[in-house]
Amino acid sequence: SVSRGLGDVYKRQILMEQPDISTPKGRRDLAMILLLYDSAARVQELCDLRICDIRIDSLPVVHLLGKGRKSRDVPLTKPCAQVLRQYICENHLDIPERRNDQLFTNPQGKKLTRSGVSYVLAKYIHKANTAVDSFFPQITPHCLRHSKAMHLVEAGKNLIYIRDFLGHESIETTQVYAKANPEARRKALETMDTRMNTPAMPDWNDDPDLKAFLKTL
């Protein structure tokens, strides 16, 4: 079902609260999971990201290389961009010599694999289920992509925009999400708005808890 996964804001909040952001690894994991959802990236696209693929300025975007080696630029929300900015600065990834390095690596400094990303997500799903008593079903990285697609449809984004956002070859593939919600489909067909209003992200050094902020995601 295309509606599986993080079906509401509360679930997303619970998941994003699980990484321990008092540790570098927890901050990396939050950045990774938040980017995976925010960009609706395929898991391999996330693994392939290099530092130069992230542009963090007044209009933050991530450059994704998808199926058939077709690339697309996906806009990022301000909260996601701020988390990424802090992750990049903290790890000194913002120097010219490192621009072609992998954005996310495993503990050995090697490129992340799809199974590695799945392992990280599964760990936090398990942690969330322990905290909230089996609150989540089995969620894979691809479920985050499904969830983002559904949320774009429900927000009334037009289908051409969603197709390009997801990197679909055909609008018919994108319509699968819209058909799951007829009213959302009508709105998606009518609207041409392509931007989302998002809150500003506090510095995690100034606000190590972040829970109040995460409620706004």
Regions found by a protein language model. Give the residues of each.
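Conserved catalytic core of the tyrosine transesterase superfamily
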Residues: 1-4, 8-217
